[in-house]
């Protein structure tokens, strides 16, 4: 029972509208919305930057894995060629 009821909130809202006017409240709401949108854009750009940095550090490891796999394939091909050469001789 210590909380604010819906009627009390409506009376407070009416007083605020009477004091500031609808134009001032509309511009204040637009400014607040623009600030929130700017904050969200800044946060998402920071997350994208971190993701790009993580991908940049992970990429050399992936390239190393490809080189290792290619080396294994080449080694297997050399062994097959050697065994064919021994069979023919």
Swiss-Prot record:
Residues passing through the membrane, by range: 1-21
Keyword Protein transport: yes
UniProt KW keywords: Cell inner membrane, Cell membrane, Membrane, Protein transport, Translocation, Transmembrane, Transmembrane helix, Transport
Record field: compositional bias (Basic and acidic residues): 47-61, 75-89
Low complexity bias spans: 62-74
Transmembrane helix among keywords: yes
Membrane topology designation: Single-pass membrane protein
A GO cellular-component term linked to this record: TAT protein transport complex
PANTHER family for the chain: SEC-INDEPENDENT PROTEIN TRANSLOCASE PROTEIN TATA
HAMAP family attached to this UniProt entry: TatA_E
Function field: Part of the twin-arginine translocation (Tat) system that transports large folded proteins containing a characteristic twin-arginine motif in their signal peptide across membranes. TatA could form the protein-conducting channel of the Tat system.
UniProt xrefs under NCBIfam families: PRK02958.1, tatAE
Protein name: Sec-independent protein translocase protein TatA
Organism field: Shewanella pealeana (strain ATCC 700345 / ANG-SQ1)
Gene: tatA
């Amino acid at each position: 029972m210590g909380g604010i009821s819906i009627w009390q909130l409506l009376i407070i809202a009416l007083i605020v509208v009477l004091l500031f006017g609808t134009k001032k409240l509309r511009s204040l709401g637009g400014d607040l919305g623009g600030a929130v949108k700017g904050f969200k854009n800044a946060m998402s750009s920071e997350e994208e930057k971190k993701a790009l940095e993580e991908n940049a550090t992970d990429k050399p490891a992936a390239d190393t894995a490809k080189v290792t796999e290619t080396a294994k394939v080449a080694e297997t091909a050399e062994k097959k060629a050697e065994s064919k050469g021994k069979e023919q001789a």
